[in-house]
Amino acid sequence: NALRKIVNTDEGTARFADVQNYEIGGKTGTADQPEGGKYSEAKINTFSSVFPTSNPQFVFVVMLDTPKKSKDYYYKYRHRKGGWKGTLYNTAGWTSAEVAGKVIDKIGPILATKYIQVD
């Protein structure tokens, strides 16, 4: 399932939405907001999720308008001149996907959507 792979693989953009014992699938979206005829650094981040992916019962969408950057989401990379640089993330995979995962973790037991993973 392509939507599940976005959440539960290292290559996926929504790993923060993965909740143990739940089959969550989804799609992230990050849009730059326009300002004065060009794009600003402000973003609108969305994560649309469905669960459980093996038998979809629920859809949950999180949309964040201008999410704050967090020091917890800091990507370090080696600069071409040899030193280390970093970027604070505030894209959907780091913000709205995490919110969705936390909410689904809390409401999942109420909705009785736990599943047993079969390999």
PLM feature spans:
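Short, highly charged C-terminal tails/helix-capping segments
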Residues: 114-119
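Active-site beta-strand/loop architecture of penicillin-binding DD-peptidases
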Residues: 1-112
